[in-house]
Amino acid sequence: MIAQHYKDMLGSKSVIRQISEWSTARGAEIGYENVFDYSLGNPSVPCPTQFTAACEDLLAHTDPVRLHGYTPTLTLPSARKAVAESLNRRFGMDYTADHIFMTTGAAGALAHAVRCVGVPGQNVVTFAPFFPEYKPYIEGAGLALRVTPPRCADFQIDFEAFAQLVDENTAAVLINSPNNPSGTAYSEETLQQLADFLTATSAKYGHHIFLISDEPYREIVYDGAQVPFVLSRTARFRSAAGSRPTPPNSTMIRSPATPSPRV
């Protein structure tokens, strides 16, 4: 027997994939260069030459048995160390390699995070518009997804509507800034208000409500805009593919508030 909730999930269609299929079909008719495809985040510029050169060097000079073998579960210590050092330089943090969890794509990292901070029967609150795949990541873990309606004037958080969705069964709040698909980055004021609300609400219900911050587009901001750095009880995710034309990978960083880097 196949689980009904999985049959329901597999039977539903992704709007993003549908748009991609329509774009491909239309491109075959009039030429793909004449179609503006805003569905999948595929590269639209060449890969950096340094990245290509590094890959070619590895293929030419590294033992193929070692090169094509499995990496450690959390990936190579040298890669995690490099990510930690980059974050420390940019944001004044004190991360070590033990704070970094690498996955193939942000999907795996998000799924891990939901299972880490929540149990079946709890809920996760996010904000519309949102990446549709959040739904199977969360519901697949046995949690309910609650969606806060958008504040269409500026796509910052509608805190009145948001507060009505958070209760004693809320395990986490999931944000995506800069947002896919609106492009809006939450302001420092919005994030501070969110932090204050979650701190007060966690105290009210007697358990932590974690903030999961999905940030694949952190590097894609314009006109001097800044994306504030979120801290405290936060699991942050970075995807290389979201900001540069390279194969997808993701970084999961533990919350500074957790007692051990292994948590």
Task: Tell me what each language-model feature is.
Residues 6-11, 182, 245-246:
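Glycine-rich "substrate-gating" loop/helix at the edge of Rossmann-like oxidoreductase active sites
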Residues 58, 165, 260:
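Conserved catalytic core of Hanks-type protein kinase domains
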Residues 44-48, 181-184, 219-221, 248-251:
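Short catalytic/ligand-binding loop motif for oxyanion handling, primarily in non-cytosolic enzymes
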Residues 64-206, 212, 218-237:
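Conserved core of the PLP fold type I
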Residues 41-43, 178, 244-245:
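Short strand-loop junctions, especially beta-strand C-caps/beta-turns
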Residues 38, 173, 214, 256-257:
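Structural scaffold positions in well-ordered secondary structure
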Residues 2-105, 112:
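N-terminal small-domain helix-loop-helix segment of the aminotransferase-like
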Residues 219, 228-263:
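Active-site PLP attachment segment
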